[in-house]
Amino acid sequence: MAHGRQQDELQDITLLGNQDNTYNFDYRPDVLESFDNKHQGRDYFVKFNCPEFTSLCPITGQPDFATIYISYIPNVKMVESKSLKLYLFSFRNHGDFHEDCMNIIMNDLIELMDPHYIEVWGKFTPRGGISIDPYTNYGRPNSKYEQMAEHRLMNHDLYPEKIDNR
């Protein structure tokens, strides 16, 4: 019979339920929090749809807006969603190219969780008539997840989208 989490399992979760939040406008990977995956014997995806991502162009300082999709197959740890929200918010004044932001996010989440598999896909709104949609992924080396990452990378965008995909 399934039961809820015990208090000692939640002691490292400090942001969820906390009404006294600090919204950092500068990149803060240390705000990320994790909790234990209680279903380690099962492969399953966790997907976050993050439609309000903002960062800055490193050259012009102009804001860039995106929807970010983060999908992962957890191992031992999972990312806590409120900490992820605050972490993504911390990119608000971070100046970097779209591709860099997606790789930074993926690397920080790998460091936090050590997932079996993870992918991060940014769908940025057009600037100058061009939208940029960087996709990055990772599968644990020497495992089926590494092969999965290779396959998904090669096939991630087989169906080109229409211009009205935003």
From Swiss-Prot:
Chief localisation class: cytoplasm
Coiled-coil residue spans: none
Catalytic reactions on record: 7-aminomethyl-7-carbaguanine + 2 NADP(+) = 7-cyano-7-deazaguanine + 2 NADPH + 3 H(+)
GO MF terms held by the record: preQ1 synthase activity
Keyword hit for Plastid: no
GO biological process, one term: queuosine biosynthetic process
Annotated catalytic residues: 57, 64
Lineage: superkingdom: Bacteria
The entry's keywords: Cytoplasm, NADP, Oxidoreductase, Queuosine biosynthesis
Gene3D superfamilies in UniProt: 3.30.1130.10
Subcellular location: Cytoplasm
Binding site for substrate: 79-81, 98-99
InterPro entries given in the database record: GTP-CH-I_C/QueF, NADPH_dep_7-cyano-7-deazaG_red, QueF, QueF_type1
E.C. number(s) listed in UniProt: 1.7.1.13
Broad enzyme group: oxidoreductase
Its biological purpose: Catalyzes the NADPH-dependent reduction of 7-cyano-7-deazaguanine (preQ0) to 7-aminomethyl-7-deazaguanine (preQ1).
Family classification: Belongs to the GTP cyclohydrolase I family. QueF type 1 subfamily.
Name under which the protein is recorded: NADPH-dependent 7-cyano-7-deazaguanine reductase
Biological source species: Staphylococcus aureus (strain MRSA252)
Name of encoding gene: queF
